[in-house]
Amino acid sequence: MVKIDKILLSIFQRTFKSITDEMSISLTKTTRSPILCEAKDFVTGLYDAKGNMLEQTENLPILSFSLGPVCRVILDQYGDDISPGDVIIHNDVFSMGNQNNDVAIFKPIFHEDTLIGWAAAKGHQADIGGAVQGGYNPNATEVWQEAIRIPAVKLYEE
């Protein structure tokens, strides 16, 4: 059986919590969207190299646990083609996204040449295209009529 150092575990947990809180504060202070800065319809988090959640803010509980599975989609899609400078965008409901208006950004974290984790943020966007304003279209017959679908795509590649 592995012995867990409770003090070290607590230090890491509080450090990760502090980081995700700072991510949340930065997003709130820099966004121009009232959906994000006033309604707090977003989440920030840290994940290990396999996409398992280490820490995540509690801004909107329905978004909890929504980013880890997308990390695994990114790993399946890109494999070893992930570099320290990459930035990946995603909102696709057919690859673990929860709705097209919730757009996520992922940044891999490396130590030397080894992927050790992910920093990610997901937030609700008022309108990202579609047949009607706001993305809610009760007459839609396909997802493309609601909003643009963005599978895991490198927004920036090192």
Label every model-predicted segment.
Residues 7, 58-65, 96-104, 134-141:
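Alpha-helix capping and helix-loop boundary segments enriched in small/acidic/polar residues
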Residues 60, 92-96, 122-127:
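Acidic, glycine-rich active-site loops and adjacent beta-strand->loop/helix elements
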Residues 25-33, 52-54, 68-108:
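Conserved mixed alpha/beta core segments that line enzyme active sites in large multi-domain catalysts
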